[in-house]
């Protein structure tokens, strides 16, 4: 299982707000920790975000993250609507 981190305090604050306002996001984060490659329709990004991953945390909420294989960590860089791309 992977550990979950945020890249900065702004992302952490936004993620906490979503967790507090939506019941199912915590469950989706748990699924992400189990398998960051397939959970919540995870997919690799292209273009300027190449090397990063994205997944759905809710109907219109996405997370952009990096997978650190060596340390078994998921580092969430951004959370929000599709505008975060």
Briefly describe each language-model feature range.
Residues 18-22:
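Hot-dog-fold acyl-thioester-processing enzymes
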Residues 30-55:
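A short, surface-exposed loop/turn module that caps and links secondary-structure elements
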Residues 1-16, 26, 39, 54-85:
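Enriched for short, Lys/Arg-rich terminal
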Residues 23-29:
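Short amphipathic alpha-helical segments
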């Amino acid at each position: 299982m992977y550990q979950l981190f945020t890249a900065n305090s702004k992302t952490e604050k936004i993620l906490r707000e979503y967790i507090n306002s939506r019941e199912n996001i915590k469950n989706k984060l748990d699924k992400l920790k189990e398998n960051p490659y397939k959970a919540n329709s995870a997919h690799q990004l292209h273009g300027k975000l190449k090397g990063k991953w994205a997944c759905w945390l809710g109907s219109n909420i996405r997370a952009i993250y990096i997978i650190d294989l060596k340390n078994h960590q998921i580092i969430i860089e951004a959370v929000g609507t599709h505008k975060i791309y």
